């Protein structure tokens, strides 16, 4: 009876969603709605930073290590130890606090093997870290950890724990089935890119808005994305200065043309009067400048010059005749 009660306690302890609690406490977010939508330490580190991720990793490991350590202190049965470890793992995978959903049980796996087989766990952990460092895929490193664990247990002489390690390997592979599919298709993102995308989450969310603003440059924003008539270009609603000037000139052109036609008609109607008026003034000046001046300038000077020449000639001839008679 006491053993069953302890298994229930181990399950409840494993069900505590430290990742969800810390994410809401330190960064006000729900890891189930961001990143990989998982409450595990890896996703919490993406969303809230490395410190919160490490804190989640430690607590998830402790909720597996503490129940197993207590089981070791109260019983020598390897079966009981293994069942306690499985209860804590199932609590993390299918949490009673999260509608029987949970994480991927990697940190809790580390916790349950920590008091059971320390050195095999260390060797498996080194292999895990080496794979993560070389490939950048945390999921691949986690799969390496649980795959290497049975072999390390055999090498370390912990053959009684091999069945537990095999069951844990199946559970962890099942929880990583989506990651395995992405790895096989080459679609899994390495840790560095995931961490960068999570850190730039705000900018990535603003990028589409900036693109939408750039796409709607020169438009009127109605506050919606409906593509309604309010998103017509502002050039249609408010014409530019050039178009307004062109329209103003276009409106003035017919008026100027009409005024030009009126002026031409008036000039055409007044043409006979203008010609008659011009002919009369021309006759009078012509009579004055041609008739009278011509008679004065021609007749009078001619008579004067003729009189002078005639008088001089008569005087000369009279003088000559006087001289001849005197002789």
From Swiss-Prot:
The gene is plsY. GO terms for molecular function: acyl-phosphate glycerol-3-phosphate acyltransferase activity. Residues 199-212 have a biased composition (Low complexity). Residues 237-246 have a biased composition (Polar residues). It is a multi-pass membrane protein. Coiled coil: none annotated. Belongs to the PlsY family. Keywords: Cell inner membrane, Cell membrane, Lipid biosynthesis, Lipid metabolism, Membrane, Phospholipid biosynthesis, Phospholipid metabolism, Transferase, Transmembrane, Transmembrane helix. HAMAP family: PlsY. Its EC number is 2.3.1.275. The keyword Glycosyltransferase does not apply. Probably interacts with PlsX. This is Glycerol-3-phosphate acyltransferase. SMART domains: G3P_acyltransf (SM01207). The chain crosses the membrane at residues 3-23, 52-72, 78-98, 112-132, 152-172. Pathway: Lipid metabolism; phospholipid metabolism. It catalyses: an acyl phosphate + sn-glycerol 3-phosphate = a 1-acyl-sn-glycero-3-phosphate + phosphate. Residues 259-271 have a biased composition (Basic and acidic residues). It is found in: Cell inner membrane. GO terms for cellular component: plasma membrane. Its main location: membrane. It is an enzyme of class 2 (transferase). GO terms for biological process: phospholipid biosynthetic process. Catalyzes the transfer of an acyl group from acyl-phosphate (acyl-PO(4)) to glycerol-3-phosphate (G3P) to form lysophosphatidic acid (LPA). This enzyme utilizes acyl-phosphate as fatty acyl donor, but not acyl-CoA or acyl-ACP. Residues 184-212, 233-327 are annotated as: Disordered.
